[in-house]
C-alpha cells in the first residue's frame, strides 16, 4: 500500500487521431503527441507521501521532451485531494518551469485542488487564464497559439 501511495500511477496523455481528444493510450493506439505540449495525468491524490516522486517525474518528463515543452497541462481530474506540503512542492516546481519559459496550465481541477493552490498563493500566480474546464480546451488554446505543429502561429 505504501508503494502505491508514494509512487502512484500516472500517464502522459496523447491526442487520439479519431476524435482529437487526449487519452492515456497504449503505444499501439492511433494517437500522437503534440510537439511542445506535455499533458500529464496523475491517478491519485497529491499528498506529502508522493509529492516528491510526482514532482521529480514531471521534471524528468519535461527535461526528456523533444522538442522542448512550451506548455505543461496538468489533467487534475483525478487529484481529488492535495495537502499543503504537496501544494508547496507544486508551487516550487511551477516557479521553476515559469523561469524556464514553460507555461503550466491546469485542466479539470476539482475544488479541493484549487483550494490548496490558493492556500500557497499559487492560484494568483497561475491566474484564471491558466485554468481550463478540460484538457481538450487547454490543448485547443495551445494549438491556437502555436499551431498543431507546436511552432509559433504569430
Task: Kindly label every feature range from the protein language model.
Residues 13-154:
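Structured cytosolic domains appended to multi-pass membrane proteins
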Residues 1-11:
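Flexible hinge motifs at transmembrane-helix junctions and intramembrane kinks/re-entrant loops
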Amino acid at each position: 500500500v505504501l508503494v502505491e501511495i508514494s509512487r502512484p500511477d500516472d500517464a502522459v496523455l496523447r491526442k487520439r487521431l479519431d476524435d482529437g481528444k487526449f487519452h492515456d493510450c497504449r503505444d499501439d493506439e492511433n494517437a500522437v503527441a503534440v510537439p511542445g505540449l506535455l499533458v500529464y495525468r496523475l491517478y491519485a491524490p497529491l499528498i506529502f507521501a508522493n509529492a516528491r516522486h510526482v514532482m521529480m517525474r514531471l521534471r524528468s518528463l519535461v527535461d526528456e521532451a523533444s522538442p522542448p515543452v512550451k506548455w505543461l497541462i496538468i489533467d487534475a481530474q483525478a487529484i481529488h485531494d492535495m495537502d499543503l506540503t504537496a501544494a508547496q512542492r507544486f508551487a516550487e516546481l511551477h516557479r521553476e518551469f515559469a523561469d524556464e519559459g514553460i507555461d503550466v496550465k491546469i485542466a479539470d481541477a476539482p475544488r479541493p485542488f484549487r483550494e490548496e493552490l490558493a492556500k500557497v498563493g499559487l492560484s494568483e500566480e497561475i491566474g484564471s487564464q491558466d485554468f481550463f474546464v478540460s484538457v481538450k480546451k487547454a490543448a485547443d488554446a495551445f494549438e491556437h497559439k502555436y499551431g498543431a505543429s507546436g511552432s509559433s502561429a504569430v
